[in-house]
Design a protein with these regions (language model features):
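Short loop/turn segments that flank or connect secondary-structure elements
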Residues: 1-190
Length: 190
């Protein structure tokens, strides 16, 4: 583990390779799992604010879930997560004509309809952030649905931290990310 300030980073974030391959996985990370995506408390209001911009993109089932329970719920572990449809799809998922799943919030952001990109936990995947008292832990999460992303990352030689540069800066800031890059370069020399 590597420590930068009060943030502890798994060496896997620096060593392992990853590059999303949406053509291969079809956005399965937004579908599979036993709960929705982790959400920070301050993101709930943003999720509610973006609803008018994405409402027509959402499935009727997703709209019904949102009407019944809201955009988030507390899962079995006590974490705030996005609401899900039929214990599977995130309520913010949409599908294109090829059956590929994508995030309606990110689509609205790219179209200039909102200034909210999507929950930071989604943006950071396959990194998961854990809280341990005064420290945050940055860990690489391995999941079978991302095998194609691992293979593409290996082929293109893209480490997890480089693939996730933008969301890591969004979460921890540019100075922190610059320190992470220095640490990664030093680690390569060893």
């Amino acid at each position: 583990m590597l420590q930068i300030g009060d943030i502890v980073v798994s060496f896997d974030v620096l060593r392992e390779k990853f590059l999303c391959n949406l053509e291969a996985c079809k956005g399965e990370c937004c579908i599979e799992g036993d709960a929705g995506a982790p959400v920070e408390l301050e993101e709930v209001e943003k999720l509610e604010e973006v609803l008018p911009a994405i409402w027509n993109e959402l499935s009727s089932e997703a709209r019904a879930v949102i009407d019944a329970q809201g955009v988030v719920y507390t899962d079995e572990e006590g974490d705030l997560v996005t609401s899900i449809v039929n214990n599977k799809d995130c309520v913010f998922t949409c599908y294109d004509e090829k059956g590929c799943c994508y995030c309606a919030i990110e689509k609205a952001y790219r179209e200039g309809k909102t200034d909210f990109y999507k929950p930071v936990s989604c943006h950071l995947y396959p990194i998961r952030i854990g809280d341990y008292g005064p420290y945050k832990a940055v860990n690489y999460h391995r999941w079978d649905v991302c095998k194609a992303a691992v293979l593409l990352g290996q082929k293109e030689d893209v480490p997890v931290y480089k693939f996730l540069k933008e969301p890591l800066i969004r979460k921890f800031g540019e100075d922190w990310y610059a320190e992470l890059e220095v640490a990664a370069e030093e680690m390569k020399k060893q």
